Amino acid sequence: MKTIIKYILAAPLMLCFSSCLEEHPKDQLDQEAIYNNADNIYKNAVASLYNYIGSNQESEGLQGTCRGIYDYNTLTTDEAMNPIRGGDWYDGGLWENMYQHKWNANDINLYNVWKYLFKVIVLSNQSLSIIDSHQTLLSAEQTRDFTAEVRAVRALFYYYAMDMFGRVPIVTSYDVKLEQVTQSERSEVFKFIVDELQDVAPQLADEHSNKEGNYYGRVTRPVANFLLAKLALNAEIYTDDNWTDGKRQDGKSIYFKVNGEKKNAWETCIWYCEQLRQEGYELESDYASNFAVHNENSKENIFTIPLDKNLYLNEYHYLFRSRHYKHGGAYGGSSENGTCATVSTVKAFGYGTDNVDNRFKINFYADTVLVDGKKIYLDNGKPLVYMPLELKLNLSDSPYKQTAGARVGKYEVDRTAYSDGRQVDNDIVLFRYGDALLMEAEAKVRNGEDGSIELNAIRDRVGMPHVEANLDNILKERLLELVWEGWRRQDLIRFGKYTKAYDQRTPLEKESTGFTTVFPIPQRCLDLNKKLKQNPSY
């Protein structure tokens, strides 16, 4: 079933837990008609939530669109930037400020991300209310399973909200009033997410969510297990409620209850990664196949955003945004000549040396560009040649302002794509087993164990020599393996490097406190709810 069922549930748009919690607009469709049996209850109260995993609207979707979660997790790091190219890509300083960590509480894009995340959280609460009020039409098993799946979706969105904003409200009822909404500490949100996922995981289907069929694109048990591994790996960060004091608890002294046993954070991460292995996930022999057109049969991908240009409006913008105009034109569309890998990123891949990582050509367009074996020519008659080492944050005075920087690759080009290559048949990879292996390697090293088997399994797959399993090599390998997948900000924070100087970026005054590791609560939300307090130093 290559479909995420279109929902017909009428849902209010909410602003920072305001209008949705104060008003209950009448549904536009007959309630009895859309909730008259178990199948319709599932479609309209559960499956409807999956419409929000991806998007074609700016700042919405977990990945695929611009000015949203992915950009704040990628273009704020040493991985990539949107450089200013003369009159292009200034956008009021948006991209430069993003890279330099100069955002503030009035950033409209951060507000839109907050609004998007809590829209889905509130809709999840509404769905739980609907399921509860229609139990007479459901079996006990259906009530249990529908409820578990919605709670898992809600936990997923709370995870992204906590990761970005730290202190956020925990709201589990659709009928709560605005004046009842209070802000929770990050550690409380973390515990809530872990408890929710551990509680519902046994009721979730154990199917592979990335494969076509009845569970395609859904939050199944392996998705929950991956997320629990990620939560455990970052437990030192998420349990820290005062992230500007320079102190945090060691993962060896943070405990989880797992399968009836007490385990520290690193042991917990390892356990959940092992569960994924037992659930049948493994590395694909061909790294690139995970990102191919029609990648639904990957044995490695765990959770994806389903894309089908004939069925969905979800989009993948990053190839379109990155390639030079002429490059996009060679595929019959257009492009925006924007996003590039930083110089430090391409150097990490060994670009310009005799030891280039074998993943470089898959992940980037660099040097002379060929399409169907033919060169692409610029308006001046010269061939298009990307210059990875000439990238600067502001290229306005550079002779390479149109061609500087290695461009986004990774996903196979869908030659039948719509909307200038934004509507494609490559599902967007959110979670995959390759990441789980690197998480397991890191957790083992942090726990005083040997993570070389997991780390070097990743390198074996792409024909690269073994390296020692230490934290420096693991962080580098995460860049080599997971570039363009939206994990770099989280990784740099966990390794204590996000607030440091890096390529073309000088730390802000007081940034050594770590205040930029969490984004500001949007000012509009503070104005609407006086019980919300701003994060430190904003």
Task: Give the label of every model feature segment.
Residues S19-E22, L117-V120, F192-V194, Y215, ...:
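Long, intrinsically disordered, low-complexity segments
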Residues Y90-K102, Y351-F431:
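Flexible, polar/acidic helix-loop-strand segments at domain edges
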Residues S19-T74, Q249-D250, C525-Y538:
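Membrane-proximal, proline-rich intrinsically disordered regions
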Residues I34, A38-A47, N51-G61, R85-F165, ...:
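Conserved, well-structured interaction surfaces
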Residues E60-N82, Y174, L204-V223, I237-G328, ...:
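Short, surface-exposed recognition loops and adjoining beta-strand edges that mediate ligand/DNA contacts
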